[in-house]
Regions:
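Core catalytic alpha/beta fold that binds nucleotide/phospho-ligands
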Residues: 1-254
Length: 254
């Protein structure tokens, strides 16, 4: 995997977590060599190992192990714990958090993965969501865009050149998915209920979620990825301050 502009980083256990308003975004490869994969597998909990074993495709299984292992490394370093000792819990819709309530109150995180690239965002003072997607061709993308976008968003989408529409579709997707993760609602509300404004532009943007069940606002920014062909976004339930993006190396020296 060709990485542009981010040096490999591995912090030591107990390194300071993000300060108020600050977010750390760690980017890593999900395609790792067998020795690294074995080391990451050793960090997983029994339920994570069970989830991995239920995946029939060998590459999908290996990427799951690589993603969960490196997530544990990132969170363990923030907490000053061994990666294998980190305990997670999940909301009914699958949003992960730390099992210990005191730890969960001071450290929020959000993982994402697409194809060969994984991302973990960490923040201390607000709920967050991150999403990364590989830009690729989708059959009948026009119909999917009509279902996903609001009226004003679709007008903007329809005006851009056809050669740019796949990229713009995924730019919309990651912003809405990251916002849904920050709110903990997943896809339940429907992406057409998430209104991005102002858009397009440099951001940060606000994303309003209005439905019978939810009225909420998140803030969202694009996160440049160091690997060509991917797009990503970060969302939070409070305004977004400084964002530090770094490449995570699971075997770099502490």
């Amino acid at each position: 995997m060709s990485v542009d502009g981010l040096a490999p980083v591995r912090r030591g256990p107990g390194s300071p977590p993000p300060g108020n308003g600050e977010t750390h975004v760690w980017v890593f490869s999900l395609d790792v060599g067998h020795p690294v994969l074995e080391a990451l597998h050793a960090l997983l909990s029994p339920d994570e190992i069970g989830r991995a074993e239920r995946l029939r495709d060998p590459r999908e299984r290996a990427r799951f192990v690589a993603g969960r292992g490196q997530l544990r490394q990132v969170i363990g370093d923030c907490l000053g714990q061994l990666p294998g000792s980190v305990r997670f819990k999940y909301s009914p819709l699958g949003k992960p958090s730390l099992a210990d309530d005191a730890e969960a109150a001071r450290l929020r995180f959000s993982p994402s993965g697409s194809d060969a690239l994984g991302v973990v965002a960490v923040r201390g003072d607000a709920e967050i969501g991150v999403d990364v997607e590989r830009v690729h061709a989708i059959p009948d993308i026009a119909a999917l865009a009509r279902r996903m976008l609001g009226a004003d968003e679709h007008k903007e989408y329809a005006k851009i050149p056809k050669s740019r529409r796949e990229t713009r579709f995924f730019e919309y997707w990651v912003r809405k998915e990251a916002s849904a993760k920050a709110l903990g609602s997943g896809l339940r509300q429907g992406f057409h209920r998430l209104k991005i404004h102002p858009w397009p532009g440099d951001g940060p943007f606000q994303v309003d979620c209005v439905s019978d069940e939810t009225r909420a606002t998140t803030w969202v920014v694009g996160v440049p990825m160091p690997v060509a062909g991917y797009t990503a976004a970060l969302a939070a339930t409070q305004p977004i301050g400084p964002v530090l993006t770094a490449w995570w190396d699971p075997l770099a020296p502490d």
